[in-house]
Amino acid sequence: MKRVLWITPSILPSSGGQAMHSLGYIRALSKVCELKVIARATLGELKQVESDSSMFQGLDVTLVRAYKFNSKFNKVRQPISKWISHNSGVMVPYRNIANTIKNVVKNFEPDIVVIDYIGMYNYYTLTKKMCPHARFVYVSHNVEFKNFTDIKTSAEKKSFASNFWIEKRKKYEERMLCESDASLCISNSDIDIFKAEFPTTKKLVFAKPLIKFAKIKSKEDLRKFGKKLLVVGSMDWYPNVNGIEWFVEDVFIPLAKSDPEYKLYLVGRKPDDRIKKLGEKCENIIVTGSVDSVDPYYKECDVSIIPVFEGTGAKIKVLESLGKGIPTVCSDFAAKDYLLNNGEMMVVPQNAKAFESAINKLKSSLETRMAIYDKMEQYMENYYEINPEIVKLFE
């Protein structure tokens, strides 16, 4: 079996979509190779793992704090490091993590090194020197430079500084894609962008999310329709903020005016000011902020709404809605990587009438809700087969 070292910024599911995607592949690939994982972790995450020893059961995972001691120097360094990482998209190298990598490489001698996420670029350059004969695989979670460009363009007029950081990110991404022996890309659309932007990229392989979600809704739950709509996601991520704002203004507020019994739950961490204002504007909108578990909301609500029309990467909330068993109205943009061709959810364009019509159909037709539930179950039964091209890379 090949010896594989996987270096990642986080694999705790609570950290978000990137971590969940990574953990899905780590679990799958640990069956075909000897896999060691080095993951950065905060003190809170280390305590979380201590309290739940089953979290990484069967996996060889080393969690490392970026800072070993809470010294005065580190208290000064931390905000500076965060500022640099925020702008460059690349984590400042920490001695504690670097030393852990050196020790593992020395004893393990990996055949393959996986650099998970562009933020680990500095650890790529370090490991490349230490493992000159190893093959390198890069895991791309988004087209980072494009997302960053979109954020800067929407937030402000491009300044010299913002242009500098955009180009910096683009160079990091180009090096990772062009120098790695293969890259795993979460979206086919991302692959198309990379090929057009960086013609010398090597092997780009589609790596659909393998995250497993526990089913929350039963078929019996669908018999009642309480007019409760749900949007789940990071409430500070610009595609979510823009999409939710459009949905509320163009679809939900008119819907709630015609039928005041409708409620919309916006569930997710770090709600942007624009999201908070939506809750203040309409009393039928509940902005929860961060919650311990989204499961009670999936259980209680009738329809999941995914109003995303921009951004790169896979939209993991599509898979989450399918896995949780909730009837869903989803933009065709968000659904494009999932091949939903058999009525597994209501896939619609960015059109207010289309969204409203889909919601009304789910409200008025128990038969439609039941049929969608059955189609979701069938889809999920066949979904989790890993791409054979990926298996070949690690055998």
Residue ranges and their predicted role:
Residues 181, 299-313, 324-326:
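Acidic donor-binding loop of glycosyltransferase active sites
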Residues 206-278, 287-295, 299:
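Conserved catalytic-core segment of nucleotide-activated headgroup transferases in glycan assembly
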Residues 317-320, 327-331:
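Short hydrophobic beta-strand element within catalytic cores of glycosyltransferases
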Residues 163-166, 170, 174-216:
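Donor nucleotide-sugar binding/catalytic pocket of nucleotide-sugar-dependent glycosyltransferases
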Residues 345-353, 360-366:
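Conserved acidic donor-binding segment of nucleotide-sugar-dependent glycosyltransferases
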Residues 9, 71-89, 137-171, 234:
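Acceptor-binding helix/loop patch of EC 2.4 sugar-transfer enzymes
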Residues 367-395:
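A charged, aromatic-enriched C-terminal amphipathic alpha-helix characteristic of glycosyltransferases
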Residues 1-62:
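N-terminal subdomain of nucleotide-sugar transferases
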